[in-house]
Amino acid sequence: VEWTGASSDLAVKDVVLITPEDYKLSQNYPNPFNPTTTIEYTLPIASQITITIYNVMGQEVATILPLQDKPAGTYRVQWNGLDKSGNRVASGTYFYTMRFGNFTKTKQLTFMK
């Protein structure tokens, strides 16, 4: 074993853990709405996400953001109150769900004719 007298620096690196809580899904505005509403969401890292509208029975009404890759950032999407067939939905309560990986966030909105 030979001693060279050289030293090396050890560094501690911060590890950033991203949790589902770091993903933000804001309350839509306006709410109640007619004819359109805006939904804002924030991604802390690049993610594959989708946003879907459901009725109170849990049936899919519309997909307002098909599955896609998005870089980190804050985004807005609008829903015009139309179902996936292009028909105006009935007045009432609906839920919008953002899916990212194995996680979901859901909020409630109200459409009024």
Name the predicted role of every residue range.
Residues V1-W3, L10-D14, N87-K113:
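C-terminal tail/sorting-segment detector
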Residues A6, I39, V61-T63, K105:
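Terminal low-complexity, poorly structured segments
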Residues A11-Y29, F33-Y54, T63-P66, R76-W79, ...:
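Glycine-centered coil/turn sites that cap beta-strands in beta-rich domains
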Residues T36, Q48, A72-T74, S91, ...:
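Short secondary-structure junction motifs
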Residues I53-N55, F111-M112:
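Residue-level detection of beta-strand scaffold positions
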Residues L65-G101:
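Short, surface-exposed loop/turn motifs with a glycine/proline- and acidic-biased composition
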